C-alpha cells in the first residue's frame, strides 16, 4: 500500500495556497497566476495527470475524468474551486497568502474554501492510482 508522505502533502497544499488566485466580483484577476495553476498541479501530482483525462474549460477551469471499470454506471462528481477573494481591508491574524503553520493549523486564504478539498482529493487520487486502484465508475472532478 502506498504511503502518503504527510510532510510533502502539507508542502503541496501550502504551494497551492500561496498562489494568489484572487478574483473579484467584477471579474478581475491576474491571468498569469491562474495560467500557472494547472502546470503546478501537474508537476505536484504527476501520477494523477498520467492517468486521468484533463480538460480546460473557459481557459482556467479544470475538469478531470478518472475512468472507472464500468462507464455505464452513473458517475461520481466532485467539485471545488481554486479562486479566492482578496485580503484587502481585512485583519488577518497571519498573512493571508503565506500559508504559515501556527499551532498545527495552516493559515491562508482558500485553506477551507476550497483549496483544501482540491488538495485532499488530489492526494487521495495520487495514492490510489499509485496502488493500482481503478474506481468502479467514472469520477469527474
Question: Model regions: which residues?
Answer:
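Acidic/His- and Gly-rich active-site-bordering loop/insert found
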Residues: 1-118, 128-137
Amino acid at each position: 500500500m502506498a504511503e502518503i508522505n504527510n510532510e510533502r502533502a502539507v508542502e503541496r497544499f501550502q504551494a497551492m495556497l500561496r498562489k494568489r488566485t484572487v478574483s473579484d466580483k467584477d471579474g478581475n484577476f491576474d491571468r498569469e497566476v491562474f495560467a500557472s495553476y494547472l502546470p503546478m498541479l501537474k508537476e505536484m501530482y504527476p501520477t494523477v495527470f498520467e492517468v486521468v483525462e484533463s480538460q480546460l474549460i473557459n481557459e482556467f477551469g479544470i475538469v478531470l475524468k478518472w475512468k472507472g471499470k464500468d462507464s455505464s454506471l452513473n458517475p461520481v462528481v466532485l467539485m471545488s474551486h481554486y479562486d479566492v477573494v482578496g485580503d484587502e481591508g481585512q485583519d488577518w491574524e497571519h498573512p493571508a497568502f503565506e500559508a504559515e503553520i501556527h499551532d498545527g493549523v495552516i493559515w491562508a486564504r482558500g485553506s477551507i474554501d476550497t483549496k483544501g478539498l482540491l488538495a485532499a482529493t488530489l492526494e487521495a487520487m495520487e495514492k490510489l492510482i499509485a496502488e493500482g486502484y481503478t474506481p468502479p465508475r467514472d469520477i469527474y472532478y
